[in-house]
Amino acid sequence: MTIRFYDHSIVKQAKSIALLDLGAMDNFMNLAYAKWLCLLIKQLENPRPLYNIDGTENKSRRLKYYTDLEVWTGTVNTTLWFFLSDLREHKAILGYPCFAATQP
């Protein structure tokens, strides 16, 4: 399932499609897309191994970067981590933490 979302950074605004995945234990954003939006990219102290949904190793191999994003659902907002990696055609994957925080 997908959902339309809107990105607002200091430099750019964009409308995109995110993949909804309750099985994903974290939120993810495409690294190239985060760079295009000029988001503040932070480096993880301890990179983590990264696997695709089908269990194969991701092309990026390890999660090295993340960004903090303010997520709005109606009038409620919360700040969530988004790990940054190569997501191929997807701009973002909203996982369990997003659902738990926003309870859409």
Predicted regions span which residues?
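Aspartic protease
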Residues: M1-R4, I10-P104
